[in-house]
Every structure is written in structure tokens, then in C-alpha cells.
Amino acid sequence: MKLRASVLIGVAILCLILSACSNYAKKVVKQKNHVYTPVYNELIEKYSEIPLNDKLKDTPFMVQVKLPNYKDYLLDNKQVVLTFKLVHHSKKITLIGDANKILQYKNYFQANGARSDIDFYLQPTLNQKGVVMIASNYNDNPNNKEKPQTFDVLQGSQPMLGANTKNLHGYDVSGANNKQVINEVAREKAQLEKINQYYKTLLQDKEQEYTTRKNNQREILETLSNRAGYQMRQNVISSEIFKNGNLNMQAKEEEVREKLQEERENEYLRNQIRSLLSGK
């Protein structure tokens, strides 16, 4: 019995050794200039794109997040992972806020691994320093049977839907009904439509102001032109009056000269007659 037990123990040990040898570790790769620091292959593999999470990509959601507004950077380190996880799994991203800030966020997301097929919609607003991001990965068609999930992504964020808010890591199915989602989407669209209408009204006011300014300039030019024409006419009239005055003066002088000449001739005749009568 002891011999049989020893044989069984030896066989068991041999099996363990063989199984351990069959699961040997993968060969390591030595990096340049670091010959004494082995690195596993998995740590240096490069991917052409960031893979999607199997659960999150199939979970319909719609999230409204208030993004921070820092002067020197966009996101804190603790916010980067969750924000990019949300952006990367979205099909549509709407950014509302300051025009320069929302453009910075769009370029930042696209330059740091966000999928190229994500549709970005930028809605600039006035007097709003922060940025609101609305991210969704579901079809808002009323016939869509999928129920969107809401998440509390960042601390201080405001979920867009009021039904059973879940954490982004939970992947729990929300109890939000499709009708509520449609109503929320309709309200957001109405808000965006108000923003668009505001900008249209602002543009119309600017155009009206420009038209009024051009009309005022035209009226001023016409007034100046009329004044210049009036002044020219006055100058012409004054010139004519002066000219006519000179002509009248010359005519009067000529008349006086003629009268003087006539007086001299008459005086000469009278003297001749007196001489004849006196017999001289």
C-alpha cells in the first residue's frame, strides 16, 4: 500500500511539472537602450484604434454633462477617462457654449482617439462661459424600441433624463421609457431651435442696422450735394447780378457822357448864334 501511494504521489508530481512546463510565460521583448528591462509583448502592442466596450456599445444612452471651464486646460485627470469613454462610445455629440471653447473640445476629442464617425454639432451661445455636452448612441426615431440609459458621468453633472440614473461602469438597464426620452429630446431640440432663432434675429438686427446706416450715409451725401448745388447756384446768381450791375453802370456812364457831349455841342451852337447876331 505504501508503495502504491508513493507511486501515485510521484505520478501526481510529474503531472504538475508537465502542466507547468506547458503553460510557460511568453517570451519577453527587450527595448533598445533598456536591455536589462524586459517588457511583455502585450505592453508594447500598438492599436490603430481604441476598441469599444462590448457592453457599453450595445447599451443605448443619452447623457448631458456640464464640462469644466479652466483657463489653462480642459479636463482634470480624474475626468479624462470617463469623458473619453463616453465620447468614444457615442454616435452624436452636441456641444453648447462659448464658440471658442466648444471648438477646442471638439478638436481635443478628435485628436485624442475619438471615433472618426462621430457626428459633432456645435451650438455657440452668448454669455455662457461653461460648456454643456449632450452625448448619445441611440436612434431618436419614435419607432425605436431600445430604451436609452442615463449615467452620472462626472461629479456635478446633470443627467438629461430623470429615470434611474446609473453609473457609467454599471451598464445596468435603465427603467427610462422611450416616450420620456422623446420628450426630453424634443425639449433639447426646442432649446437649440431657440438658440438658432436668437442668432437669426441678431443677424437680422445687424443687417437692419447696416441698412439704416447706409441709408443715413446716402441721405447725408444727398444733403451735402444739394447744399453744394445750392451754393453753386447762389454763386452763379451773384455773378450774374454783379455782371448786370456792371453793365448798368457802364450804360449810365455812357448816357452821362452822351449828355455832356450834347451839352457841349449845344453850347457851341449857342455861341455861334450869338456871334452872328452881334455882327462880329
Curated annotation (Swiss-Prot):
Lipid attachment site numbers (N-palmitoyl cysteine): C21
Membrane topology: Lipid-anchor
InterPro entries: Cag12
Cellular component GO terms, alphabetical: plasma membrane
Cell membrane in keyword set: yes
Annotated keywords: Cell membrane, Lipoprotein, Membrane, Palmitate, Signal
Signal peptide: 1-20
Highest rank taxon of the organism: Bacteria
Lipid moiety-binding region (S-diacylglycerol cysteine): C21
Cellular compartment(s): Cell membrane
Protein name from the UniProt record: CAG pathogenicity island protein 12
Organism expressing this protein natively: Helicobacter pylori (strain J99 / ATCC 700824)
